[in-house]
């Protein structure tokens, strides 16, 4: 049996090894062993400590786990006050700060330490004989809340210092934040549980850190960044600069911002400010400015303090990304695809460096989830070039006259019915062929290659036609003449003549192409073909009810409802009538003959996926040949796929087909199959 001294040495070695791996994983973001090996080490430590509970030490990694809930936080007095920094909001104020420093020190230039200003919760960590013993919030700067148990759950906070300090007590200061990715993950969890979402990472970090139950804190991912240490007179001879303190903290396995640095003079300060402003959105954590500190510690002592802030440091703040203002009303904006988006009209507020009067509310569900009412005081966020959005309501400031928002059931632009399909968050205008807001998208789709295929009618030309009010619906394309088109930018008479010819040629089409060209939501090429096969006359298709539509291949309840909504809208029916009056026509296929041919084809009823580059024909040409013989072409490989036709550079679809055991054909094999008019063709 092992002696207790040997067990104690094993425990010490395990704790040291696990602490090293925690540092590599949580601080350096570069693990050096697999998770399974780490878990094995941790379980071994747990088992030994269960056998020898009297050998458990406060710095053991097992002691990070949550403790029983507290009833209230105790108060802790800071031995050295945690003072806040004076803020600078303009470059002039930063220039004035540098001038005061130079004059007070009687020097021409000053060396500064520069750091990002974290937007989190400032805390203090006290190490006694190298072991973390106390942790507290800033509080009022003199007294904070004892959150030691919660801080111990944060993996990036060392429970033991790597080397001994000169004094028995060593105090580290820094910021607890929630990384942006962890914030998104937490809010996703909150959303799935039907619980309130956090407005921003700072609120999430503060709320998580100030939990009376440290198990809740342990379950949320928090990160600690060290940015200073409180030096005693015994420590001071070992450091001459603030930047040296940060280097020491890194050596003790604290996480220190990579963007820290040093610079000289006010020009260096302002360069750093602008560099960090440009980096701000790409950083993994939120910052609300930068911090300038005189780097020389002797100079810091000379400058001293004023009131509740040091003279030797200042926070240069970025323009606020969040601000509160009154929500005056909610209007509906209709997008180019018919989406109805609620937009908040706001009392003007300066946020993110600009004056904001409008902010997106995304959709009806978001308005309800955030419990937004007209007349509320709301928090508006604008980060960089991101569209301003309302992130939260301040319910305590809700006036008695506040009104709930009701999503309209008709499009505010064209008056068509507005519908929201099952499972979708967006309400949409059903007047796709008529609605002015959807005009450009509707006409571009109508003329696209897979629809009516009007050669020469590109987006820029469509923009001109609509902006000059020459075209309002797709039917107006057939009223255009050479003289009108020749008057447009970059349209000579020859180009105009060619376009008129292309428009005229588009009148002879097929029913599947025409159905697809209408732009019915969720109706792609395959569904358009299925609809045309079921109802060879357009009038017949327009009168099918939802049950009849769902009998058609590829048409489920959502697609069926979308078709019903489209053809129920009088504006759409009028545009279709105008198109037919313009001379659009297609041959009525003889389904009996076609079915007979398809029945005898080895391709009939089979599902194909095309991938890669074929030697002698395009994938579109191959698709047409397959469909002519009753086959179906889809875009993804599944167990329902009959064949994958692979050319050169086939990609992942080929690999998936092999994995599922699906037959893979080359072009020659496909052509052979197409020529094999036999019901007994092998798969």
From Swiss-Prot:
One Gene Ontology molecular-function label: DNA ligase (NAD+) activity
Catalytic activity: NAD(+) + (deoxyribonucleotide)n-3'-hydroxyl + 5'-phospho-(deoxyribonucleotide)m = (deoxyribonucleotide)n+m + AMP + beta-nicotinamide D-nucleotide
UniProt xrefs under PROSITE patterns: BRCT, DNA_LIGASE_N1, DNA_LIGASE_N2
Protein name: DNA ligase
UniProt cross-references to Pfam families, sorted A to Z: BRCT, DNA_ligase_aden, DNA_ligase_OB, DNA_ligase_ZBD, HHH_2, HHH_5, Nlig-Ia
EC number: 6.5.1.2
Native organism: Nitrosomonas eutropha (strain DSM 101675 / C91 / Nm57)
Leading EC class: ligase
Active site residues according to the UniProt entry: 117
Functional note: DNA ligase that catalyzes the formation of phosphodiester linkages between 5'-phosphoryl and 3'-hydroxyl groups in double-stranded DNA using NAD as a coenzyme and as the energy source for the reaction. It is essential for DNA replication and repair of damaged DNA.
Keywords for the protein's UniProt record, in alphabetical order: DNA damage, DNA repair, DNA replication, Ligase, Magnesium, Manganese, Metal-binding, NAD, Zinc
């Amino acid at each position: 049996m092992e002696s207790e001294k040997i067990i104690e040495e094993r425990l010490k070695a395990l704790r040291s090894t696990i602490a090293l791996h925690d540092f590599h994983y949580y601080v350096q973001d570069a693990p050096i062993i697999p998770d399974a090996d780490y878990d094995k080490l941790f379980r071994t430590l747990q088992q030994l400590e269960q056998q020898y509970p009297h050998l458990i030490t406060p710095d053991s990694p097992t002691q990070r786990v949550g403790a029983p809930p507290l009833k209230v936080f105790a108060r802790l007095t800071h031995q050295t006050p945690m003072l806040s920094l004076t803020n600078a909001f303009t470059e002039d104020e930063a220039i004035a700060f540098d001038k005061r420093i130079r004059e007070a020190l009687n020097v021409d230039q000053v060396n500064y330490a520069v750091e990002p200003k974290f937007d989190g919760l400032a805390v203090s960590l006290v190490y006694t004989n190298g072991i973390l013993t106390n942790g507290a919030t800033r509080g009022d700067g003199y007294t904070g809340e004892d959150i030691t148990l919660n801080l111990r759950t944060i993996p990036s906070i060392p429970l033991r210092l790597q080397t001994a300090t000169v004094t028995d007590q060593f105090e580290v200061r820094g910021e607890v934040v929630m990384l942006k990715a962890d914030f998104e993950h937490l809010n996703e969890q909150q959303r799935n549980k039907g619980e309130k979402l956090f407005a921003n990472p700072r609120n999430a970090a503060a709320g998580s850190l100030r939990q009376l139950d440290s198990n809740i804190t342990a379950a949320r991912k928090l990160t600690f960044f060290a940015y200073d240490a409180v030096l005693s007179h015994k420590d001071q001879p070992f450091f001459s600069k603030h930047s040296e303190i940060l280097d020491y903290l890194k050596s003790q396995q604290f996480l220190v911002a990579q963007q820290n640095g040093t610079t000289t003079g006010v020009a260096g300060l302002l360069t750093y400010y602008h560099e960090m402003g440009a980096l701000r959105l790409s950083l993994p954590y939120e910052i609300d400015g930068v911090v300038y500190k005189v780097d020389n510690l002797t100079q810091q002592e000379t400058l001293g303090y004023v009131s509740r802030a040091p003279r030797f440091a200042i926070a240069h703040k970025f323009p606020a990304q969040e601000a509160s203002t009154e929500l005056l009303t909610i209007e509906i904006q209709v997008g180019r695809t018919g989406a109805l988006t609620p937009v908040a009209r706001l009392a003007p507020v300066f946020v993110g460096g600009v004056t904001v009067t409008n902010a997106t509310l995304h959709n009806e569900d978001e308005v309800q989830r955030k419990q937004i009412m007209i007349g509320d005081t709301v928090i508006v966020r604008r980060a960089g070039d991101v569209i301003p959005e309302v992130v939260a309501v301040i319910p305590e400031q809700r006036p008695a006259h506040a009104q709930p928002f009701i999503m309209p059931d008709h499009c505010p632009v064209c008056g068509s019915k507005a519908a929201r399909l099952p499972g979708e968050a967006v309400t949409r205008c059903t007047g796709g062929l008529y609605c002015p807001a959807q005009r450009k998208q509707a006409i571009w789709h109508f003329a696209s290659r897979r629809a009516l295929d009007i050669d020469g009618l590109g987006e820029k030309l469509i923009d001109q036609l609509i902006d000059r009010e020459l075209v309002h619906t797709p039917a107006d394309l057939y009223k255009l003449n050479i003289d009108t088109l020749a008057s447009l930018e970059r349209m000579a008479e020859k180009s105009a003549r060619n376009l008129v010819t292309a428009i005229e040629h588009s009148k002879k089409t097929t029913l599947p192409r025409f159905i697809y060209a209408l732009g019915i939501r969720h109706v792609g090429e395959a569904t358009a073909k299925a609809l045309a096969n079921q109802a060879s006359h357009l009038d017949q298709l327009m009168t099918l009810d939802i049950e009849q539509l769902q009998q058609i291949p590829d048409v489920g309840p959502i697609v069926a409802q979308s078709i019903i909504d489209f053809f129920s809208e009088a504006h759409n029916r009028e545009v279709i009538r105008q198109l037919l009056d313009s001379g659009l026509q297609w041959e009525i296929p003889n389904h009996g003959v076609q079915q007979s041919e398809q029945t005898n084809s080895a391709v009939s009823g089979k599902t194909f996926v095309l991938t890669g580059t074929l030697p002698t024909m395009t994938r579109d040409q191959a698709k047409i040949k397959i469909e002519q013989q009753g086959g179906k072409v889809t875009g993804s490989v599944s167990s329902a796929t009959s064949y994958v036709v692979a050319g050169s550079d086939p990609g992942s679809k080929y690999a998936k087909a092999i994995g599922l055991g699906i037959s893979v054909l080359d072009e020659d094999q496909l052509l052979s199959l197409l020529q094999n008019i036999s019901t007994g063709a092998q798969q």
